[in-house]
Amino acid sequence: MAEYVNYVLGSLYVSDTATSTIPTDVRNFIAPPFPLNFWSGPTFTVSSNTEGGS
């Protein structure tokens, strides 16, 4: 059984003498919200005015 349980930055952190774990949870990540249209951005799509061929 774990020696102690505490919360790191609002997420659950469980620890004992041999191992420790932070259960997977969205609160474990410090990052801005991921944009919903990320994959439709110009880096990942072909522009309609791009000419093909060589």
From Swiss-Prot:
It is found in: Virion; Host nucleus. Keywords: Capsid protein, Host nucleus, Viral genome packaging, Viral release from host cell, Virion. Its main location: virion. Plays a role at the late stage in the encapsidation of viral DNA, assuring correct genome cleavage and presumably stabilizing capsids that contain full-lengtht viral genomes. Located on the external vertices of the T=16 icosahedric capsid, may bind together the tegument and the capsid through interaction with large tegument protein 24. It comes from the Viruses. This is Virion-packaging protein UL25 homolog. One of its GO terms (cellular component) is viral capsid. The keyword DNA-binding does not apply. It comes from Equine herpesvirus 1 (strain HVS25A).
